[in-house]
């Protein structure tokens, strides 16, 4: 029985493929037929008018026989093409397809009869009562308020491998039109019914990764299935199935939010409530009424970065840089992108390179020279001595030259590089060190990030004769207390760290100094001015896509 149904399905597919080929062939033979008729007509016109022989003054009778042969050839070709076109038109396979099946199989609408899917499966799915083994299985429940014409139908070819409950009750057929799942909405407590052939086998299948058994909210008490009745709702692919389930999920979510008693029967996932008025939801609307939170007027220096970098605290600061206050709406997104850029571009490669250098040191017989254990002076000396063997050590030492406590710095760099977006970052403190809390003798996370950011740009900017140490960016664009920037110079454009603990940063631009702000907002203002005022150029280096590639964090703003 199963092999016979499979052969039927294969013959159906072969027929549709043949129809597609014949539809394409009809267009070709019709075009050739019209072309041959046109050529034969032109030659016949010349034969009667004798235009060529008169114009070229040649003997007419030899030319007439040649033209007669060509006219006969083109006429025969035209007759043959029209005969093939008539054959394809009149002897085309008579097959009935629904509009959705015609679209899925690529069969032209003119090549097949349009009919509801029930015409295809009426004779293949006889109605019968469910077997006892089907009792107790969860099946799809459906809304009683929906009309039968809007209920979905699923073919086994679309839901094979999905829900074990459904798969176990489907007939073992390879035909995509053998049986389907449908719903009933005759009364409120009723759910669905199922029809299967008497000899159909039951078999389990693995749960599909997409729908997860067609979602548990559509499962209900033991019930039965019936065959489909409407062609409009015949589902033919997984995308339509997923769209339907998502829409029903949203409807159920709205119903549950409007339910006065979540424990009542009407509020359970099995049932759907669409008949309530707006007044029935008044108590819920009052309960979930939206209320504005109060803003903090003066961020405390002891609070975390989230408070200090709030939108309210940054309004006046950004107002001095740009008049567009709508930019503040993008501040959180810019900050997240910038943190991710620092992590992926600087922190993670730096930690990996440090581990690589430590491994090379051990291979060279210098296990005592390990980054995170040796002093910064020993590392600088080793960078000079081992430069031919480990050329990257000199670059790494510049990133580490911020604190004498190299062990804490190395461990903190590894902690900050974890999580993808520096999730352990603390703007006014750092991490624990050897079981004790962070103290002021250790650098803050803000100081570490600022240092590695400046060092990275030092490596990207070309060397300058005024700064033989190679710190071009740091010397020109970063001033740390107790030093102060020259505000009388209009060309000064730098970041000023006005306080160490807690760390405060100010942006100096065109003789103006912004109010204190957190690290990331100050760096964002610095980069935003470069993008909007300096055309993305920091000196001779492009910070855009063709250079450092950091200005992408602002998008099109």
UniProtKB/Swiss-Prot annotation:
It is found in: Membrane; Nucleus envelope; Golgi apparatus; Cytoplasm. InterPro entries: Cytochrome_B561-rel. Residues 141-156, 194-205, 219-228 have a biased composition (Low complexity). This is Transmembrane protein 209. It comes from Xenopus tropicalis (Western clawed frog). Residues 125-140 have a biased composition (Polar residues). It is a multi-pass membrane protein. The chain crosses the membrane at residues 28-48, 60-80. Residues 108-156, 194-232 are annotated as: Disordered. PANTHER family: TRANSMEMBRANE PROTEIN 209. Keywords: Cytoplasm, Glycoprotein, Golgi apparatus, Membrane, Nucleus, Transmembrane, Transmembrane helix.
């Amino acid at each position: 029985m199963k092999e016979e149904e499979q052969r039927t399905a294969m013959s159906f597919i072969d027929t549709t493929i043949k129809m597609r080929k014949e539809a394409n062939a009809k267009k070709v033979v019709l075009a050739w037929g019209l072309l041959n008729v046109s050529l034969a007509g032109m030659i016949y016109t010349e034969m009667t008018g004798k235009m060529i022989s008169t114009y070229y003054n040649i003997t007419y009778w030899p030319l007439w026989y040649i033209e007669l042969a060509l006219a006969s050839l083109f006429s025969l070709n035209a007759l043959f093409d029209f005969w093939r076109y008539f054959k394809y038109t009149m002897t085309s396979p008579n097959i009935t397809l629904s509009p959705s099946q015609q679209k899925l199989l690529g069969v032209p609408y003119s090549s097949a009869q349009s009919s509801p899917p029930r015409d295809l499966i009426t004779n293949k799915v006889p109605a019968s009562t469910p077997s006892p083994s089907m009792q107790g299985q969860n099946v799809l429940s459906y809304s009683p308020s929906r009309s039968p014409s809007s209920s979905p139908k699923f073919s086994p070819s679309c839901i094979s491998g999905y829900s074990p409950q459904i798969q176990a009750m489907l007939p073992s057929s390879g035909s995509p039109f053998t049986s389907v799942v449908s719903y009933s909405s005759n009364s409120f407590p009723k759910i669905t019914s199922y029809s299967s052939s008497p000899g159909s086998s039951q078999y389990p299948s693995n749960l599909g990764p997409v729908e997860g058994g067609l979602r548990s909210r559509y499962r209900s008490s033991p019930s039965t299935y019936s065959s489909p009745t409407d062609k409009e709702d015949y589902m033919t692919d997984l995308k339509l199935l997923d769209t339907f389930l998502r829409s029903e999920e949203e409807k159920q979510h709205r119903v549950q939010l409007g339910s006065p008693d979540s424990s009542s029967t009407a509020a359970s996932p099995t049932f759907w409530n669409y008949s309530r008025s707006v007044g029935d939801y008044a108590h819920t609307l009052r309960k979930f009424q939206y209320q504005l939170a109060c803003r903090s007027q003066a961020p405390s220096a002891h609070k975390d970065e989230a408070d200090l970098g709030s939108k309210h605290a940054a309004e006046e600061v950004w107002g001095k840089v740009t008049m567009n206050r709508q930019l503040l709406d993008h501040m959180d997104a810019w900050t997240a992108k910038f943190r991710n850029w620092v992590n992926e571009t600087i922190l993670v490669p730096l930690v990996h390179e440090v581990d690589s250098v430590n491994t090379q040191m051990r291979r060279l017989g210098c296990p005592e020279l390990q980054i995170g254990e040796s002093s910064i002076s020993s590392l600088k000396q080793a960078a000079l001595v081992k430069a031919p063997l480990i050329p990257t050590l000199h670059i790494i030492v510049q990133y580490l030259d911020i604190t004498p406590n190299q062990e804490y710095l190395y461990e903190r760099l590894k902690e900050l590089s974890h999580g993808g977006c520096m999730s352990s970052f603390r703007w006014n403190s750092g991490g624990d060190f050897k079981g004790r809390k962070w103290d002021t003798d250790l650098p803050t996370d803000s100081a570490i990030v600022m240092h590695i950011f400046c060092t990275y740009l030092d490596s990207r900017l070309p060397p300058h004769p005024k700064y033989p140490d190679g710190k071009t960016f740091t010397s020109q664009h970063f001033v740390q207390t107790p030093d102060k920037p020259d505000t009388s110079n209009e060309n000064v454009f730098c970041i000023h760290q006005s306080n160490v603990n807690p760390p405060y940063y100010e942006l100096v631009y065109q003789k103006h100094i912004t109010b204190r702000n957190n690290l990331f907002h100050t760096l964002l203002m610095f980069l935003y001015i470069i993008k909007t005022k300096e055309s993305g150029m920091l000196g001779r280096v492009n910070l855009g896509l063709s250079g450092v590639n950091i200005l992408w964090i602002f998008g099109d703003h």
